[in-house]
Structures are given as structure tokens and as C-alpha cells.
Amino acid sequence: MVSGTVGRGTALGAVLLALLAVPAQAGTAAAADLPAPDDTGLQAVLHTALSQGAPGAMVRVDDNGTIHQLSEGVADRATGRAITTTDRFRVGSVTKSFSAVVLLQLVDEGKLDLDASVNTYLPGLLPDDRITVRQVMSHRSGLYDYTNDMFAQTVPGFESVRNKVFSYQDLITLSLKHGVTNAPGAAYSYSNTNFVVAGMLIEKLTGHSVATEYQNRIFTPLNLTDTFYVHPDTVIPGTHANGYLTPDEAGGALVDSTEQTVSWAQSAGAVISSTQDLDTFFSALMSGQLMSAAQLAQMQQWTTVNSTQGYGLGLRRRDLSCGISVYGHTGTVQGYYTYAFASKDGKRSVTALANTSNNVNVLNTMARTLESAFCGKPTTAKLRSATSSATTVERHEDIAPGIARD
């Protein structure tokens, strides 16, 4: 173990690095074609994120049973408690991958057709019968993202909804006030509205809450003991990292945004988890443990986002500088940035978290954890490529994607 301290104001920061050897399963030796994770590079990313305004940051890499864990800074600015990789946090839009898994399991069970109209299952919900389940799950429905209105002003918008409880229909109504942004299937346009519809589909087809379906289909089978869906409760259970929202105004004081209902997101963004549980989840997903091979292939039918990113069905693909593609999701919710991705075979996974948001510099810096985790120590050429590709990271796409903040 390597440890040290980093000062940040009056709060104590901590750096942790641990390598834990865990017996690998038979026939699942670490993928030989992946370079070893670059722990020095990971630590540098966390240090940079703190210098850019994050109170704390952490990353956990599961390399086929060998665990790399690093953390720096604080979980709680008031007490100075150091952040650790066991702290729970709000995962934001990583929730979309959980919702997508449930829907694809329902396809496997013959209860859902990806190419059927959403209105087949939820009559009259959407203004166009041509909008399909597949288009909703791939952000090609044209449904306007209501969070653009909610969070046009970051802190006032958050304070106006932090204790509110919305119904799914409330959120759909907010979206439909604007009409659609494009014809069904015509374009990729990220919208939280799509995964509100996903939650409605889950509840209609199963007769259960999304909380029950997440628990029975994912949390319990994978033994995700740090993962919860507590909406509309405002408290994160157990030991957790506090979240700190950066105001739009330069130099404004960070706002403790830890406690909120997240009712504005629900099945689009209200899950709570940990680095270990998200690593476990995406490893299980990519190794085929959560659905049939046919549905996993459907999940990976990509729509182009930009030159280095694609979006499937509740799943992101990122193409890294070393030629490796990784699969998972990003998450932004007030006070938390999350990156959670795995290799194609699920044998290596990484989850990175900074406990701030509305800070584009931290957002783009934390994306570099993927390069260090999957591409290893950079050559000069890789370093130039990684630096260039960092500028293409989506900026605040997971929340209020239509609002420019930088």
C-alpha cells in the first residue's frame, strides 16, 4: 500500500493505492492483449481533478481479479473525512444501463418487442405511434429532454427540485410541452425523457416498481450489496461520499447536494452504488451473465455520437487512443461525475468518481481514467492521441444536454 496526504483548504485529503490479488476463475486469465493498468497515470488524473475543484476523486480497476484502488481528497468537506473507494455515491445516468438490462430481459421473456411502438404498451403516452422501444433506448425518439428547462440555471434549478416528488407522467408532460426535436429514428439526441419512458415500460409490463425489478433481476443475483434505488427517500444509505455542486458563477461556493429525492430522474438516474458494485455489474453485463447473447448483441447496435463514441441500448461505447473500445455508461447527477466501463469480454472493468459536477474541466479529466485503466502507460504518440480525444468528451450530456455551460 502506498499512501500520502494532499492538503485542500482546511480539509485533509488522502491518497490510497492498493493491489489486492483475488483468485481468478478457471479459464479467465487476464486478457493478454490489454496492457497493465497505469496506476501512476490514474493517480495523476485524480490529483488533477482535485486541482480543478473536485473535493475528492477515486477509481477502482478490476483486472480479472487483481484490484487497483486509488482515492484522493475528501468525502465530506465539513469533517475532512477522506474519500475511499468503498464510499457509496449517486451514479446518475449509469442508472440507464440498469433500466436497459431489465427491458432486454423482458424481451428475452417474450414480454417486449424492441421494434414495437411504445404506445402499444402505454397507449396514448407519446404523440407519435412511430416511436419505438428501440428508439427510446438509443436516444433516437426525438423526445425533448425536460432537464434542459429544469437546470437552465444550475443551483436554482437544483434547489427547486431537490425535495420534490414527480410522477413519471409529470416528467413526460414537461417534455411534451416542447414537441419533438426530430422525427422518430432520424437522429441521436440524448434525452432523460427516454429513460423515464423506460421506467414506465418496466412497471407496466411487470406490475412491479422499478425498485423491485432492479433488486430482483440485478442487485440480488449479482450480490450488489452497496447498490440501492431509494427514490423518493433523500438519504444515501451507509457510508458515502457527499456530493458538491459547482455554481454557474465563477468562484461561487460549492453547494452540498448530497441529499435529494432525484425524483426528476428516477429510472433515468436515481441509482446509488459503489465502485466495486459498478465494476461487478458491467463485468457481468459484458460477459453475458444478465441476458441472452442475442439481446446483448442488440444492446451493442451502435448509433454514432461522435468520432470516438457510440450509443447502443442504454450502453455507451468509447474508442480509446490505443485502439481498444470499452463499454459502459457515464453518470452526472448534482455533485457526482461517474465513469463506469468494461472491456468487451468483461474481464477488466473500471469505475471512477469525482464528487462534484457542473465543472467541465473535472468531467474531461476524469475521462482520462479510461486511458490509464485500459491502455496502460502512454507512449508519446498515445499521450498526444489521448490529449486530443479528451476534447471530444460529451459535456454535461447526461443532464440538461441542451445547455452550454463552458
From Swiss-Prot:
Residues 1-31 form the signal peptide. GO terms for cellular component: extracellular region. It catalyses: Preferential cleavage: (Ac)2-L-Lys-D-Ala-|-D-Ala. Also transpeptidation of peptidyl-alanyl moieties that are N-acyl substituents of D-alanine. It is an enzyme of class 3 (hydrolase). The keyword Ligase does not apply. Residues 387-406 are annotated as: Disordered. GO terms for biological process: cell wall organization; peptidoglycan biosynthetic process; proteolysis; regulation of cell shape. It is found in: Secreted. Pfam families: Beta-lactamase. Residues 393-406 have a biased composition (Basic and acidic residues). The active site is at 93 (acyl-ester intermediate). GO terms for molecular function: serine-type D-Ala-D-Ala carboxypeptidase activity. Keywords: Carboxypeptidase, Cell shape, Cell wall biogenesis/degradation, Hydrolase, Peptidoglycan synthesis, Protease, Secreted, Signal. Pathway: Cell wall biogenesis; peptidoglycan biosynthesis. Its EC number is 3.4.16.4. Substrate binds at residues 151-154, 190-192, 316, 330-332, 357-358. Residues 381-406 form a propeptide. Belongs to the peptidase S12 family. Catalyzes distinct carboxypeptidation and transpeptidation reactions during the last stages of wall peptidoglycan synthesis. Mistaking a beta-lactam antibiotic molecule for a normal substrate (i.e. a D-alanyl-D-alanine-terminated peptide), it becomes immobilized in the form of a long-lived, serine-ester-linked acyl enzyme and thus behave as penicillin-binding protein (PBP). This is D-alanyl-D-alanine carboxypeptidase.
